[in-house]
Structure formats: structure tokens, C-alpha cells
Design a protein with these regions (language model features):
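Bacterial N-terminal signal peptides
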Residues: 17-31
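Catalytic cores of eukaryotic secretory-pathway lumenal/extracellular enzymes that build
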Residues: 256, 265-267, 276-277
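N-terminal secretory signal peptides that target proteins for export/translocation
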Residues: 1-16
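Surface-exposed patches in mature extracellular/periplasmic domains of secreted proteins
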Residues: 69-75, 161-164, 266-268
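Helical hinge/lid and interdomain linker segments adjacent to catalytic or ligand-binding clefts
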Residues: 40-41, 46-50, 80-90, 140-248, ...
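Generic start-of-chain signal for non-secretory N-termini
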Residues: 4-8, 34-39
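Hydrophobic targeting/anchoring helices
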Residues: 37-145, 154-156
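Catalytic beta-strand/loop cores that center a nucleophilic Ser/Cys/Thr
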Residues: 145, 152, 249, 260, ...
Length: 365
């Protein structure tokens, strides 16, 4: 039976005009052909993207499902390309992100552009969804911390870990550890002067002291020193550590002060050790060297690593910084860290905002 005779028979049986049935059939096969050709989903990360954070979440979801994925560094803000699957396309729609379904020959053209030696772009295969841990007190809610809030919004799964989990050897369970608002020196963020009578500050101090005692330490600074050393072991074992704000400088300060008492009496009940600041061991540090501790224990500053108060006073409308344009083909990791839909970024103020370049170890990027 020919196709035409079959169509006429179907049209009579179901009271559908032959012309309408023909249009439906042609449309069906055209759709099949387009589906066969459209083999990639491109998630642009430039200004045209409706939701950048959720786009990262979709990329994570795709990798966790075993979907082939590539990160196109410096191509339209660091776009993602993935093997086309209906489930992936549905996920893109559900999360409200911008995406494009492109043909294989179109993607081949994109790859040719990226591979051009004269173009500062590179392709990175994404093969494993990292297991993420965020170092944060268990009492903190996702909206209390910018990191957990961003991950929660992006729908990227993570676990909270804190001092007990670190000391219990749980870090090797993860690929990535994130540190944010933290003080590894045992000085409780140096919030004493402004917040010593605040209920939240007193509760955090009491909880830290209970944890220290339960772990056999007489001081919180000793507890934090042990935690810092466990984190260093995690990094030495191949773990990725991403630190922000006060976690950056306070971490290296804690490593440099192993076995020393750099805390004054309002933080640990007794004065700092004699000449403790002059006995710091910078060889223990990951990133910084030759820094000087801030002598006033009531000052909201740990050391001269941070240049928040010395980089020059800027108004909010004047505070911007530009992302460095690394070589994508040679410096892949720093290029990944600088992927963004904007090159000029609005400034911000933190306890640790920017670093004194003279105090960064020469082997550090």
C-alpha cells in the first residue's frame, strides 16, 4: 500500500481532510528532522541571560545526570554547551533560564572560533559534579550567608560543615570547601568593641567555647588552629578551597600562629603571648607573607593584609574594579574564576575587601 493510499484511508476513517492530514504528517517529519539536527543546548552567559545563577545550577544538574557538557570560556560570558536532551530542555524552562537549541554544524562553527589561536577563548569539558561543603555554623540559615543563599537559589546541592565535622575527618568526603565569614584566629571576628553586649555575639562566643571544651581545647583559638590545619591537609590531599572575606587573611594568620597565643584577654581570658607577633611562621601560610598583626585588639581588623582602610576613600558611586583578562588557553583556572557577563564590577565593602600585593607570596597568582 502506498503512502498516499494509506493517508486517504486514514482520512476517510477519521473524517479528516486529506490536505489536513498531509499537513500534519509533513509537520511531524519536519519536527523530527529538526530534532535530529538540533543536537546541542547552548546556555549563554552574557547580558542576554535572564538568570545567571540558575544557569550555573542547570549546568551542575546536567553534569550530575551524566549529560555531556562543555564550558566555553570567554564565549558570550562563559557559556555552557550540552548534549541535547528533552529532560535538560525541560529543566531549562522550569528554572526560567535563557537557552538556545542549536544544530551540530552551528556548534562546530563555535568550536572553530574558540580554537582559533588568535582568539582568547577555550573549551573545558565538565565531567564531574563536585561535592560541595560550606564551612558555616549549623545555626545559620541560607539567607544569613551570601554563599549559601546563592547556592540555594541556584539549586546547587551542598552540605554545611563546621568545626566538629572538620575535626572528625569529614572533609575528604568533598571536592570543594567554601569559607566565607569566618575568623580562624579565635578572636570572634573582632566584633568585641561594637557588639560585645549583643545577644547574637554572646551566643556565638558561648557556642564556640562549648565546642572547644568538648574537643579537649581550653581556648577557641586552639580549636580554630586545629581546624585550620585540617583544612590545609584537605588542600594538600587535592581538595579545592575557595575563601572569601575574612576567611582569607584570618586563615593564614591562624596557620602562622600555630602554637602561639595572639589573642588578648577579652577573647581568651589571658593576655597574648610575649612577642607573639614577631614569632609568626610565614612558611606555614598558603598565600601571604611578612604581614603584621593589628596590635589594637578592639580594632575591626586582623592585620595589614587587608587594605580596606588604606586603599583610598571611595564613594559608593566611584567604587568599581575590572576583571583581569587572563589567557584562556594557557591560564585556564584563573580564566574560569573570572567568567562573568560584565567586565567591570561594582565594588563592595567587607571585613577583608582587598589585599596588599606586597604581602602575597611570589608563587601565588
Amino acid at each position: 500500500m502506498t503512502i498516499l493510499r494509506l493517508l486517504r484511508k486514514i482520512s476517510k476513517r477519521f473524517a479528516i481532510s486529506f490536505q489536513a492530514l498531509w499537513v500534519i504528517l509533513v509537520g511531524f517529519w519536519v519536527g523530527i528532522a529538526q530534532q535530529a539536527e538540533a543536537t546541542r543546548i547552548l546556555i549563554p552567559m552574557d547580558q542576554g541571560q535572564k538568570d545567571h545563577l540558575k544557569s550555573y545550577g542547570v549546568a551542575y544538574w546536567a553534569i550530575s545526570k551524566g549529560i555531556e557538557a562543555q564550558w566555553l570560556l570567554n564565549y558570550r560570558g562563559g557559556s555552557f554547551a550540552m548534549a541535547h536532551q528533552m529532560g535538560l530542555e525541560s529543566e531549562c524552562r522550569l528554572r526560567g533560564i535563557s537557552y538556545e537549541v542549536i544544530a551540530e554544524n552551528t556548534y562546530a562553527g563555535i568550536l572553530a572560533e574558540i580554537q582559533d589561536p588568535a582568539v582568547n577563548m577555550e573549551l573545558v569539558k565538565l565531567e564531574k559534579a563536585p561535592r560541595i561543603a560550606v564551612y558555616t555554623p549549623p545555626t545559620k540559615q541560607p539567607w544569613d550567608d551570601a554563599v549559601t543563599m546563592a547556592l540555594t537559589y541556584a539549586e546547587i546541592p551542598y552540605d554545611k560543615v563546621y568545626d566538629p565535622e572538620v575535626l572528625d575527618g569529614k572533609l575528604p568526603m568533598y571536592d570543594w570547601l567554601h569559607l566565607h565569614h569566618e575568623d580562624f584566629t579565635g578572636q570572634f571576628g573582632r566584633f568585641y568593641f561594637a557588639y560585645r553586649n549583643a545577644a547574637w555575639y554572646q551566643a556565638e562566643v558561648a557556642e564556640a567555647e562549648r565546642t572547644a571544651l568538648s574537643r579537649g581545647f581550653t581556648k577557641v583559638s586552639q580549636l580554630k588552629s586545629a581546624v585550620a590545619q585540617r583544612i590545609r591537609e584537605f588542600v594538600a590531599g587535592g581538595g579545592f578551597l575557595f575563601a572569601m572575606c575574612s576567611a582569607t587573611d584570618s586563615y593564614d594568620i591562624a596557620l602562622s600562629a600555630i602554637g602561639l597565643d595572639i589573642c588578648e584577654s577579652m577573647y581568651d581570658g589571658d593576655p597574648a603571648g610575649p612577642s607573639a607577633s614577631s614569632r609568626l611562621d610565614y612558611n606555614q601560610c598558603l598565600a601571604f607573607k611578612d604581614f603584621t598583626l593589628t596590635p589594637n585588639p578592639l580594632e575591626y581588623e586582623f592585620s595589614d593584609i587587608d587594605v580596606t582602610n588604606t586603599r583610598g576613600l571611595l564613594t559608593e558611586n566611584e567604587d568599581f574594579f575590572a576583571l583581569f583578562d587572563f589567557s584562556a588557553k594557557w591560564d585556564v583556572v584563573p580564566t574560569m574564576l573570572c567568567q562573568n557577563h560584565q567586565q567591570v564590577i561594582k565594588g563592595f565593602m567587607g571585613q577583608t575587601t582587598a589585599f596588599n600585593k606586597d604581602l602575597i607570596k611570589p608563587e601565588v597568582l
